[in-house]
Amino acid sequence: MADLKITLIKSAVHRLPKQRAIVKSLGLGRVSSSVVKPNNEATRGAIFHIAHLVNVEEVK
């Protein structure tokens, strides 16, 4: 299973507190910051809630 590269493309400022918490829990800080996370249900669930703020790519 491939990992996921998650890039924050929109700011979390002025978003719901739950969405800000998810962005922080994924390890994303500033706009254009990226992290590589395992492709599992927990990560997919977090991405579902902030899909409008991030860009997701599969990496090997």
Curated annotation (Swiss-Prot):
Cysteines joined through disulfide linkages: none
Pfam families: Ribosomal_L30
Domain of life: Bacteria
InterPro entries in the cross-refs: Ribo_uL30_ferredoxin-like_sf, Ribosomal_uL30_bac-type, Ribosomal_uL30_ferredoxin-like
A Gene Ontology biological process term: translation
Alphabetical keyword list: Ribonucleoprotein, Ribosomal protein
Gene Ontology molecular function: structural constituent of ribosome
GO cellular component: large ribosomal subunit
UniProt xrefs under SUPFAM superfamilies: Ribosomal protein L30p/L7e (SSF55129)
Residues forming coiled coils: none
HAMAP family in UniProt: Ribosomal_uL30_B
Quaternary assembly: Part of the 50S ribosomal subunit.
Family of this protein: Belongs to the universal ribosomal protein uL30 family.
Protein's name in the database: Large ribosomal subunit protein uL30
